[in-house]
């Protein structure tokens, strides 16, 4: 299966060793931006690693990529669990284990500046009718986002702006444009 996996480290307390952050340059209609990203993967065992990494690196923009698995199989709640964990941790100001002293200090008031929610595999789930709505800026009306409404309302209450968009990473459709538009929030 082509999902992200990380090796464990440590003798007594096993912790996942995260990949190094990488710099990428994205371009869209004359705009350029360098982003520093780290692909942590969506497995439930990596959720606390997300939070630790966000706080340690003082991440300003959180990009969450979901797909349409929950539309195909209603029992698959991986995407909802991941976003729910992130929103609840930000709302409760949860401090994950393994933070440095500086990270614990930063965690007291940490909140990202924005969240970008990208629905991947648009080539599989987006119909021509919803493509027209996407062009008009109403992509959030698609049923793929219905299961995330509660978390999006919570983020709104926490004053964290959210940009919702559709992408197809397989074909490179709207990936860089969606990120650039998300950074403009």
Walk through the language-model features, giving the residues of each:
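P-loop NTP-binding cores centered on the Walker
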Residues: 13, 37-38, 69
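Conserved GTPase G-domain signal focused on the G5
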Residues: 168-185
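Conserved C-terminal guanine-recognition region of P-loop GTPase G domains, centered on the G4
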Residues: 54-56, 61, 65-158
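Switch I (effector-binding) loop of TRAFAC-class P-loop GTPase G-domains
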Residues: 1-32, 45-47
């Amino acid at each position: 299966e082509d999902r992200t996996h990380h090796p464990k480290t440590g003798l007594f307390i096993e912790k996942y060793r995260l990949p190094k952050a990488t710099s990428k340059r994205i371009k869209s209609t004359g705009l350029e931006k360098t982003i520093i990203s780290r692909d942590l993967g969506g497995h439930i065992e990596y959720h606390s690693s997300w939070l630790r990494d966000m706080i340690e690196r003082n991440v300003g923009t959180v990009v969450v990529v979901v797909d349409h698995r929950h539309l195909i199989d209603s029992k698959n709640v991986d995407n909802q669990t991941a976003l729910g964990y992130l929103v609840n941790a930000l709302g409760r100001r949860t401090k994950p284990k393994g933070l440095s002293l500086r990270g614990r200090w930063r965690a007291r008031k940490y909140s990202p500046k924005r969240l970008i929610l990208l629905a991947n595999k648009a080539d599989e789930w987006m119909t021509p009718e919803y493509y027209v709505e996407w062009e008009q800026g109403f992509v959030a009306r698609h049923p793929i986002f219905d299961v995330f409404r509660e978390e999006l309302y919570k983020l709104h209450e926490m004053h964290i702006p959210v940009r919702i968009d559709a992408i197809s990473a397989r074909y490179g459709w709207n990936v860089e444009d969606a990120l650039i538009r998300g950074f403009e929030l």
